[in-house]
Amino acid sequence: VHLIKSLLVVTAVALSGCTTAPTLPPPTFPGIEQSNKIAIEDLRPASESEKKIFSLMVSSDAYAIYRVADNATDPTGPRLLAHRAYEAFPQLAEQPSIKVLHFVTYANMQSHLRRSVTQGLLIGPVGMALVGSPSYPSSEVLTSAINSEQLERTAGDQEHTRAYFTEQENPSKSPVNVIYIDAEILGKRVASRCLVPPVTGKPNLFLVEAFDMCIANHLALHRSINPATAPQ
């Protein structure tokens, strides 16, 4: 258990800032100060901004699932959401505020670490656990609209299930990040789930870059979704 715990802790540190072990400096966002005027009403459960390893037991359904802390990136997810919304919606100049009901990120390394433990291939925690290992095929970010009630139903003891994925979404069972965004912008509330596998063309992907991809998709959903036909 001590070895597994050490593996997860080092992995957690590695994943806190990046998804695929970049060697380059993290990206910057020129002009982000222009959106400082956008007030962020943070209505998230306090726990969503905190780091957590859900289980160290290999037999647990929550094994190797990790919640990423807000301070893992600069800017934070909600701050980057406000900036991209400011760029996307000129109307925010007249209504300079957004409500963030959920913005939370999970790392799911369950299949990867179970395989490693079972086969006894613990050849170094960072090498074995980083998302984006060369042994996994690259894919694309997958974003879908969800009913925000899904997040309420999975709070508490079921929170780890938010990091699950289907075989169709991730047939190779690669380590992934799963990012949930639930925000009200210009009076319209939209919730989304974004699955980030090792990304094609991005061998060195920072977590904040994954945020940016998911936010772009979320804002596209915001434009296209009619509240009357939103997911139930």
State each model region's role:
Residues 5-6, 113, 203:
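Hydrophobic alpha-helical segments and their boundary regions
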Residues 18-121, 228-232:
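A structural "domain/chain start" motif
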Residues 21-24, 91-187:
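Surface-exposed short loop/turn segments
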Residues 57-73, 163-231:
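Short secondary-structure boundary motifs at beta->alpha junctions and helix caps
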